[in-house]
């Protein structure tokens, strides 16, 4: 296995865990981040586990059950340390994208943009 293949496998592992963690709750979701992690959104950059936890807690608290029923991944790919996700939860979110930079088994940087309905 080459170093690039190992990195791609590690990225895929973190990415898949991140997606499945939403169903398990905030503590499971936070396992993908550390104190050096940052989530960049159009509104603000959320730095470190405390701010990232607050960001996700607000997201989870604001999502009604119908949101999760409508949630659908429309595109998913990994390339080395980068993972990309496009998703929808119509009519709540017609399109959203996430890009993750994975380093040392954690999401080091994530971008998130949800396009309004």
What feature does the model see in each segment?
Residues 1-31:
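Short, low-complexity N-terminal intrinsically disordered segments enriched in polar/charged residues
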Residues 95-117:
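Short beta-strand edge/turn micro-motifs at domain boundaries
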Residues 33-34, 89, 114:
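Short beta-strand segments enriched in hydrophobic/aromatic residues
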